[in-house]
Amino acid sequence: MAEYGDPDTEEWKFLRQHSPYQLLRHDRLGIAEDGKEMTADDMWTCPKVLFTTSTRDDRVHPGHARKMVKALLEDAPAEKVPLCLYWENTEGGHGGAADNKQRAYMWALTYAFLAEVLGL
C-alpha cells in the first residue's frame, strides 16, 4: 500500500479488519463481519487509552483522534471503555510539540498515563 487511506477495495478489506475505529463501528452497530447479529459478550472491549495529537498536524489531521475519542465516549457502552484520555496541543506539528517544553509536557502526560495503567 503506497498511502494509508488508499481507496483500493482489496486493501480496504484488509485495513477494515485491523482498524480500531472500524472495529468499534461494527460493535456499535451490533453486526459482525459475517452479517450475524452480535451479543454484548461478542463485542470488542477497548483497553485504557491515551490519544495525543496536535491541532497543526499537517500530515494526520487531529479529526481522526477526535472522531475516535467521540465514538469511545459517546457511542460505546461505558463498561467497554475503562479509561479514555485525550490531549491536543494547539501549537506543535506532526511530532505533537512545537518546542522542548511542550515535548516534555507531552511525555510527562504519557508517562503518567503508563504509570496509572501499569499500577506503578
How should these model regions be labeled?
Residues M1-L120:
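Active-site-proximal cap/loop segments of hydrolase catalytic domains
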